[in-house]
């Protein structure tokens, strides 16, 4: 659906990553001595517009600098002009956002979570206790009052509730990388064009002005075929 979400004027974008895995967790993969690139931890990068709730870009990959740049390049293609963008504290965003979006004149900030103890990683079933957040301006002139990732984090919770393969503490997980990718592609297309947002009372696509009606499932499947 990338061709329908391209060069959009936006105001405020929030980015985050969602952890899952394919086949087995990265720790198990390491113990087995496997170098199979199609199994292990799988991170879904998500960019959502604060006001329209439209998912502007997403990317399935590893939590690396390379995949972070691939994600921010997709966000750059989906947008135009200046806007505010807030990410979590993942260090790779600092270079990736400036590299991909700096020429557009974005105002970039990070919301860094402070933990009671050093978190092992977001792959833990019981994350370390978050005791606060620190707003860190990185590039441009971000509005401190708008530095937030609450909307994208709420959306990521909805993703986990909607797709069993992303639900924690279950025996459900993706067995193949391409199956997870296909599921995510359908989810985001359905979310943007078919699913009426409870707050907006229309779909994000209608709110963003890229659709004039609520899509039926059949229409979505034909468009993505």
Question: Which stretches of residues belong to each language-model region?
Answer:
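Residue-level recognition of single "structural anchor" positions
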Residues: 1-225
């Amino acid at each position: 659906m990338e061709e329908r979400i391209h060069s959009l004027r936006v105001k405020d974008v929030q980015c985050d990553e969602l952890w899952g895995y394919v086949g087995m967790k990265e720790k198990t993969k390491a113990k087995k001595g496997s170098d199979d690139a199609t199994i292990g931890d799988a991170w879904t990068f998500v960019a959502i517009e604060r006001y329209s709730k439209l998912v502007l870009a997403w990317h399935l990959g590893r939590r690396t600098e390379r995949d972070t740049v691939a994600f921010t390049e997709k966000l750059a293609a989906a947008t135009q002009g200046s806007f505010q963008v807030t990410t979590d504290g993942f260090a790779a965003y600092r270079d990736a956002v400036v590299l991909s979006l700096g020429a557009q004149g974005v105002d970039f900030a990070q919301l860094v979570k402070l933990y009671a103890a050093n978190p092992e990683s977001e792959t833990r079933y019981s994350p370390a206790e978050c005791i606060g957040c620190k707003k860190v301006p990185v590039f441009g002139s971000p509005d401190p009052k708008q530095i937030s990732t609450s909307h994208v984090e709420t959306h990521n919770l909805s993703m986990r509730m909607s797709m069993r393969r992303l639900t924690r503490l279950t025996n459900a997980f993706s067995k193949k990388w391409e199956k997870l990718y296909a599921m995510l592609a359908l989810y985001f297309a359905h979310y943007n064009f078919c699913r009426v947002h409870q707050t907006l009372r229309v779909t994000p696509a209608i709110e963003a002005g890229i659709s004039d009606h609520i899509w039926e499932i059949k229409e979505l499947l034909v468009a993505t075929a």
